[in-house]
Amino acid sequence: MSRRPRKRHVQLTLDQARKPDGRHGGWRPHAGRKPKAGSISHATRPAEPARFPQHVTLRIAEGAPSLAREGLMKIVRAAIRDSQRGAPQATQGRRAHRAAAADHNVTRELTRRGVSADHGETSELASRGGFRVVEFNVLGNHLHLIVEAASKDALASGVAGLEIRVARRVNAALGRRGKLFPQRYHARALRTPREVRNALRYVLLNRKHHTAAQRFGRFWIDACSSAPWFTGWAQPIRGDEPWKRELLALPPPTAPPETWLLATGWKRHGLLRFDERPG
């Protein structure tokens, strides 16, 4: 009985491996695991000059409750305020102790992630130009931020610190475990006055982008955003409803802009109107 010849295994060159022969697969256009919807590329982020504000988007984990609910909205707003104003210095007694412990946990988590905690964690650092949240809008499953950052590292550590702070507080309030922000954040530099104005309109009036226009009055502002404290409206905000008066009486949770583009430059194209819609 004759033996079958032993199969010869031939080592393919890289060029051969990239050209499928119809039997063995190989590299093909659009082959492999498909990216998840809404996922962000893990390519290295470019280092943007500090003079350019950035539009940052944070997506919430699937299945997590809407952060635009009133109770959670207050938690997120407080986290934004504390991330750049230094909560321990603004509180007393046990509240100060809890705030200091929370800041320590944020710093420890940043260290575990391998992210520098040298930027954007306290009001002292914010005043040195590390990381500032200038405007925001909290929607059901994502957050829009307009921020200023002194460097690429300042942006990374500032966003990471804010994510940790929001996640810890929201999870504690809900008795929830697990990541609240599982995806990488998206960031886009705003390089011109027109780009900055468009981004401000998009962030502050974003709810109009998702909801029918007839739901909004002529002087409507979004209670889940920084619109009540925004100083670039073409008309003064009317305190004609109790919730507006309540918000207007609060100190701003955001930081004032320091870049020319975000403080002054965008106004060349006109102040924002309440009746505008995001593009």
Annotate each predicted stretch with a short phrase.
Residues M1-Q54, L58-R59, A64-G140, E148-G279:
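Short Pro-Cys-Gly-centered "Cys-loop" motif that presents a nucleophilic cysteine in a tight turn
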